[in-house]
């Protein structure tokens, strides 16, 4: 057998050493970028909303740009930062073009979803003109949103004592139905340390049961706890808390109201209440809601409560909801008051905890919206949306008939609607986060939905009963009626189990992936072996050359 030349042997030995290292640790990614290059943007034509007018007066158009690619493993704070940085960099060419063009006016920019609101003179500018920008993906209308239409007449009372009179309980029926006080007693918490942002018609801070958060009690604008947004999503400077209707004060009271009458009205009365005015009386816009959500995320809101929406499936709400959730906020939304086989956005977005209504007996009222949603029914949904092919809304139901809460002017009011149900769930989320501050939105959602209970057999649910209406029950109740105590117990147990698993073993990840980490013992050992072999070969080679 021919011998290997002495000059080649060291090289082969070195190659063998480093191949040994490579086989031990596998491929290692260099840097934080994906190994696969992202496709060039702008390959596909932009999607123009068919509802956008193409002639006549100026039109408010929302121009949507490519969303940031946020790795799942990064934290909430870094997610927010990356969203803002990405929006700023990708929007600049469009903004420069709009500011220098006749027929275009920049009204607002957004980062929670990568979007710019423009006023467009359709006689001077075609929507297709935006296709010149590779980052632009779609153009759609500034969708109108509103408070879900009230299902029946609302009875108001001027006196809190009168509104709550006759009750032998020290909580409203709704709090008892979701077992809020059981959480108070078992876990010694009423929502302390948790921030809930209600986005609605405003709030009356003069109400004795409403305590709005503020960074400066001497400042009448309630900095950090209050914000008002106009129809374009612009922050209204110098705004002080007020309610343009009655809806926002009522919803806020159910989330975190007090008990000055002796009867508690709020699920999480010690939670920090934030309020963003995004509806004037009952109506608002997509831009207002997104601006309010951005503000809530910036204020480190742990939960965002949305008792509003637009009937139908409106894909523009998908990215704001999932980005808010990725930024650490639980998003809760009402399904609407249009009855079976209907729902509204953003409540019907998969990442929202969608909430329908029940009465005090556990029956779903006829007005409560719910349906099975096929993903293909969403027009222009994000291609990377992870919603399943089919899912049901609501996720859960909560008290939404004759719900008593605060009313502007210091009184109390009984109101129906899924708008009243949603804040019961937002308050429940606050209780859970007070117990487990590090719980993720996914963990909160799982705890709330998987512990919800169905009513006893025979309870009327729309046109069916629990005894024989399984298909209808699914779209009327979702997982069932929210049970705050059961959800708290499940969350605590799940996190304890997770902590025990981490402490007693290792992660659930593929051990081969851990071996490829530059900080892993396998990686370090492999490097040391390769370096040692290299040094030994070089030393021997030098000796042989002497």
PLM-predicted stretches and their roles:
Residues 1-41, 322, 502-546:
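Secretory targeting signatures
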Residues 344-434, 486:
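Extracellular S/T/G-rich loop segment that most often corresponds to the catalytic His/Ser-adjacent loop
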Residues 74, 171-176, 180-256, 260-267, ...:
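Active-site core segment of subtilase-fold serine proteases
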Residues 58, 192-195, 269-274, 299-304, ...:
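Loop/turn elements at helix/coil->beta-strand transitions in domains of secreted/extracellular proteins
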Residues 3-4, 10, 93-175, 216, ...:
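Autoinhibitory propeptides
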Residues 200, 336, 417:
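Active-site glycine-centered loops adjacent to acidic/histidine catalytic or metal-binding residues
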Residues 234-313, 356-359, 455:
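Subtilisin-like peptidase catalytic core
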Residues 303-305, 352, 434-515:
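C-terminal subdomain of the subtilisin-like protease fold in secreted/lumenal serine endopeptidases
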């Amino acid at each position: 057998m021919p011998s290997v030349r002495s000059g080649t042997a060291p090289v082969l030995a070195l190659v063998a050493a480093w191949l040994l290292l490579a086989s031990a640790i596998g491929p290692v990614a260099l840097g934080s970028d994906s190994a696969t290059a992202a496709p060039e943007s702008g390959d596909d034509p932009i999607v123009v909303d068919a509802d956008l007018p193409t002639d006549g007066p100026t039109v408010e158009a929302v121009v949507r740009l490519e969303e940031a690619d946020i790795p799942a493993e990064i934290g909430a704070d870094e997610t927010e930062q990356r969203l803002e940085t990405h929006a700023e960099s990708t929007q600049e060419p469009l903004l420069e073009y709009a500011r220098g063009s006749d027929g275009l006016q920049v009204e607002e920019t957004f980062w929670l979803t990568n979007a710019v609101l423009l006023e467009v003179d359709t006689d001077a500018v075609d929507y297709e003109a935006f296709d010149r920008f590779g980052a632009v993906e779609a153009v759609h209308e500034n969708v109108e949103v509103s408070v879900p239409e009230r299902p029946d007449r609302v009875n108001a009372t001027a006196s809190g004592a009168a509104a709550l009179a006759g009750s032998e309980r020290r909580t409203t029926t709704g709090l008892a139905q979701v077992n809020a006080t059981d959480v108070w007693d078992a876990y010694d918490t009423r929502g302390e340390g948790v921030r809930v942002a209600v986005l609605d018609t405003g709030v009356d801070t003069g109400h004795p049961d409403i305590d709005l958060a503020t960074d400066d009690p001497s400042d009448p604008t309630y900095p950090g706890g209050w914000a008002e947004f106009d129809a374009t999503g612009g922050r209204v400077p110098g705004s002080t808390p007020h309610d343009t209707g009655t809806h926002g004060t009522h919803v806020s009271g159910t989330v975190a109201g007090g008990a000055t009458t002796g009867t508690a009205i709020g699920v999480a009365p010690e939670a920090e209440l934030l309020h963003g005015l995004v509806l004037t009386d009952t109506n608002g816009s997509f831009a207002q809601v997104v601006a309010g959500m951005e503000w809530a995320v910036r204020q480190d809101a742990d939960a965002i409560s949305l008792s509003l929406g637009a009937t139908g499936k409106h894909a523009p709400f998908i990215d704001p909801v999932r980005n808010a959730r990725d930024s650490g906020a639980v998003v809760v939304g009402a399904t609407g008051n249009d009855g079976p086989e209907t729902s509204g956005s953003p409540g019907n977005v998969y990442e929202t905890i969608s909430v329908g209504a029940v009465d005090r007996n556990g029956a779903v009222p006829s007005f409560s919206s719910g349906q099975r949603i096929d993903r293909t029914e969403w027009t222009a949904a994000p291609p990377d949306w992870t919603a399943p092919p089919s899912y049901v809304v609501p996720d859960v139901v909560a008290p939404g008939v004759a719900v008593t809460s605060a009313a502007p002017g210091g009184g109390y009011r009984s109101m129906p609607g899924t708008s009243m149900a949603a804040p019961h769930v937002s308050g429940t989320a606050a209780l859970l986060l007070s117990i487990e501050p590090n719980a993720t939105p996914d963990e909160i959602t799982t705890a709330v939905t998987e512990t919800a209970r169905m009513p006893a057999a025979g309870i009327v649910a729309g046109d069916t009963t629990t005894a024989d209406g399984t298909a209808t029950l699914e779209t009327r109740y979702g997982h069932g009626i929210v049970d705050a105590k059961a959800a708290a117990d499940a969350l605590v147990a799940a996190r304890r189990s997770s902590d025990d698993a981490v402490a007693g073993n290792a992660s659930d990840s593929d051990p081969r992936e851990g071996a490829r980490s530059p900080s892993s013992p396998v990686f370090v050992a492999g490097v040391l072996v390769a370096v040692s072999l290299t040094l030994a070969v070089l030393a021997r080679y030098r000796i042989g050359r002497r």
